[in-house]
Regions:
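Cytochrome P450 proximal C-terminal region
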Residues: 35, 123, 127, 173-177, ...
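N-terminal membrane-proximal hinge/A-helix region immediately C-terminal to the signal-anchor transmembrane segment
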Residues: 1-98, 118-125, 208, 336, ...
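Conserved cytochrome P450 K-helix/beta-meander segment immediately N-terminal to the heme-binding cysteine loop
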Residues: 353-381
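Conserved cytochrome P450 K-helix E-x-x-R motif and the immediately C-terminal K′/meander segment
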Residues: 17-38, 214, 218, 300-341
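Cytochrome P450 I-helix active-site segment
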Residues: 7-11, 116-120, 171-177, 228-235, ...
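Cytochrome P450 catalytic-core helices
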Residues: 267-292, 403-418
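Cytochrome P450 heme-thiolate monooxygenase catalytic core
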Residues: 2-8, 72-77, 95, 111-270, ...
């Protein structure tokens, strides 16, 4: 039985006092033990009503939102607006519907059979880098390695160029600063501010956003100058038109391409960091993984057709997404007074649908904190509570890249662990934090050696 890192759950008042006194910016530290048992209830004490919603039918009500009562929260919009404007990730209503209709055709290029060569190229580059690390015996940051790898793949998919292109590498560097510094939820303000209070971003975050948008603009201008010279997602977004024949402006194009880069690499990097950490500390899992690869693939290269048959590898990734969902919280705001089940919801209330909590809920999962990939086997489907597993969201705003992310992860985990053993330094010191995505509090340092 293996229980990977998790925060200590405390009574609500103690959790609140620790956060307030220590200035802890990790929202996971604010979650009381009761959150993992309630169907719907308050997240400690705060000036604005803040509710954690766990009951699956209420989660569906909030995320499907047929009446438009629960748009994405002001906290999320304020945090991301300097980077991605009023783009598809944060917009709502008619604006979102127009953008989604325009962008959807471009996402056909994220279909895994089309994108698989980009994944293979990125994986080959990562193998070469890890081989250099193994030869030198040097230590490196697992977090940054996974971010670099997934950014390389999404750049190849969106812009037809990997991170060896200087502009793409500059975007990655600035995104790293942004991810480390952005304050989606500054907890003291969450506790004491009223709804719709604007939270100013830090100067280093705003500077990172300026750099990212500048570098994305340079990549975009290269595509605009080339005309029809590319067959990639960026070109399709450039060509997109709405029902009235209008395309995106240059600033809107930067908004949308920023979303694709952010969503296409940051979430995958989060999940892969945790998957690699878990496998690095559990040699029995790695042995099963390699045995499956030998059985399914043999000694040859891992192809697209193999990824669908690597069941254990896929279930390792699915279980990683359960315990470490990349998007820890899906915050919504109540635009009007309403009810969720028997609970009165005030206008301006912050509604926290939390995959982190839902995936560890005591009523919905057997041994919820245990890492158990076999819980996803067909013969154990009866243990699953419908609607209690939402790593890619739910409803019309479900992640359009879910299949892409899954095949990408299966390929990367299988190829890299087939060739290398990963050795994490001080694994007992690793702890999770809710930032832009679910990340370790401090960078996870590791070494690699050739697999036996």
């Amino acid at each position: 039985v293996y229980i990977p890192p998790r925060p200590i759950s405390r009574p609500a008042l103690i959790a609140l006092l620790r956060v307030a006194l220590r200035g802890d910016g990790n929202l996971l530290a604010l979650l009381p033990a009761a959150a993992y048992r309630m169907e719907i209830g308050p997240l400690g004490w705060s000036r604005r009503q803040t509710l954690v919603v766990n009951r699956p039918e209420l989660v569906r009500q909030v995320l499907l939102d047929p009446e438009g009562i629960f748009p994405k929260s002001d906290l999320m919009v304020n945090a991301l607006a300097p980077l991605i404007g009023d783009s598809i990730f944060v917009s709502s209503g008619e604006t979102w519907r127009r953008q989604r209709a325009m962008i959807d055709p471009s996402l056909t290029l994220m279909r895994v059979n089309r994108a698989f060569p980009a994944m293979e190229a990125g994986c080959a580059a990562a193998e070469a880098t890890l081989a250099e690390h193994a030869a030198r015996g040097g230590r490196f940051s697992l977090d940054l390695a996974m971010s670099h790898l997934t950014a390389d793949i999404i750049c190849r998919t969106v812009f037809s160029s990997g991170l060896e292109h200087q502009a793409a590498h500059d975007v990655f560097d600035a995104f790293t600063v942004f991810e480390r510094c952005v304050a989606q939820v500054e907890i003291r303000r969450l506790i004491f501010d009223r709804a719709w209070t604007r939270v100013p971003q830090k100067p280093d975050v705003l500077e990172a956003c300026r750099l990212i948008r500048g570098h994305l603009g340079a990549l975009l201008d290269g595509h605009l100058a080339a005309g029809a010279g590319f067959d990639d997602i960026a070109s399709k977004v450039i060509e997109a038109r709405d029902l009235e024949g209008r395309g995106f402006t240059r600033e809107e194009l930067i908004d949308q391409l920023g979303v694709l880069f952010l969503a296409g690499h940051e979430t995958s990097a989060s999940a892969l960091t945790w998957a690699f950490f878990i496998l690095a500390t559990q040699p029995a899992l790695v042995a099963r993984l390699r045995a499956e690869i030998r059985e399914v693939v043999g000694e040859g290269p891992i192809g697209f057709e193999h990824t669908k048959r690597l069941t254990f590898v896929r279930n390792v990734f699915r279980e990683t997404l359960r315990l470490y969902p990349p998007i820890t919280f899906l915050p919504r705001i109540a635009n009007e007074a309403t009810r969720l089940g028997g609970t009165a919801v005030r206008r301006g209330a912050l509604i926290m649908v939390a995959p982190w909590v839902l995936h560890r809920h005591r009523a919905y999962w057997r041994d919820p904190d245990v890492f158990d990939p076999d819980r996803f086997l067909p013969e154990r489907e009866g243990e699953m509570t419908p609607g209690a597993y939402i790593p890619f969201g739910l409803g019309p705003r479900i992640c359009a890249g879910a299949a892409f992310a899954t095949i990408e992860a299966v390929l990367l985990i299988a190829r890299l662990f087939r060739r290398f053993d990963v050795h994490v330094e001080a694994p007992e010191e690793v702890e999770p934090a809710a930032r832009l995505t679910t990340r370790p509090v401090r960078q996870v340092m590791c070494r690699v050696t050739p697999a036996p």
